[in-house]
Amino acid sequence: MTALISQPDLLPPPAPERCPPQQTARLFRETPLLLDCGQVVQDVRVAYHTYGTPSDHAILVLHALTGTSAVHEWWPDFLGEGKPLDPTRDYIVCANVLGGCAGSTGPAELPRVNGEDPPLTLRDMARVGRALLEELGVRRVSVIGASMGGMLAYAWLLECPDLVDRAVIIGAPARHSPWAIGLNTAARNAIRAAPGGEGLKVARQIAMLSYRSPESFALTQSGWGTRRPGTPDITTYLEHQGEKLSTRFCERSYLALTGAMDRFQPTDAELRSIRVPVLVVGISSDVLYPPAEVRTYAGLLPRGQYLELQSPHGHDAFLIDPQGLPEAAAAFLHGA
């Protein structure tokens, strides 16, 4: 099924007083976690947020590369009363991934492999997430994720098929193309060439070019000297984005998470084994994960459906220009 989404969602973000605090769980204290690389990890810390009344069925939100478990901070179009993630109706869980830097166990706390941080996988992250759900008493989930979170949703479908009822995958392929791996390689090389923060700034600038589109930048960054005399607006915009990320993100996490995405290469046969309903959403102007690529993977899923978000703003449209996507996601998540 293909749909063109064009109506904006004008509902306000959730009120601050309804935003819960971050919580922390300590997992794998008795039985250690075996990583795909062969390393054993004991006492894994997982930072997470929950919304709504605890239940044995939850909606599991999977965050993007530099995201956090605080869904209310980055996805107000999706979280709130009357929205796809409705705390008055649903029990919603979002956890910071293993290897990230927003409260969960990070690369510096993991056993090293040949003197380097261990090569984490998305399946490792799914196994940690499963342990958290068991800790919370959750037996079944509907999954929603975008970008890296969408790729992680594929990992959940393959690693935990007994837990997942259905999934919404937004702006994500099942496996990275040479193009996507190349962009990540350039970003990682920038970090390694200039450790200590400067490389991370450049990595973010590279990424931002793939998160938007030529049309988006023409609409929003075509000025000259607006922010700094004699400097193109696109230049100051990219520099600002790099500075912002460098104050809140860890370069080792950036290396670990982009590497995990690149290593996730499920076969077509594995994708055809997924038996639950999956809504796959492409974005019309996405240059990072072109819609034709995303649609191809949807076609491999026996119960896959495909929708396309029409937006000029590229990959990040799921955050900044979701239009009618929240309504479509809500209908799918709740079986309409």
From Swiss-Prot:
AB hydrolase-1 domain residues: 58-321
SUPFAM superfamilies in alphabetical order: alpha/beta-Hydrolases
Localization terms from the record: Cytoplasm
A Pfam family per the record: Abhydrolase_1
InterPro entries xref list: AB_hydrolase_1 (IPR000073), AB_hydrolase_fold (IPR029058), HAT_MetX-like (IPR008220)
Any one biological process term the GO annotation gives: homoserine metabolic process
GO molecular function, one term: homoserine O-acetyltransferase activity
Superkingdom as given in the UniProt entry: Bacteria
Documented EC number(s): 2.3.1.31
Chain residues that bind substrate: R204, D316
Catalytic-site annotation from UniProt: S147, D286, H315
GO cellular component term of the entry, any: cytoplasm
Record's catalysed reaction(s): L-homoserine + acetyl-CoA = O-acetyl-L-homoserine + CoA
Pathway: Amino-acid biosynthesis; L-methionine biosynthesis via de novo pathway; O-acetyl-L-homoserine from L-homoserine: step 1/1
Quaternary structure and interacting proteins, as annotated: Homodimer.
Protein name per UniProt: Homoserine O-acetyltransferase
Gene: metXA
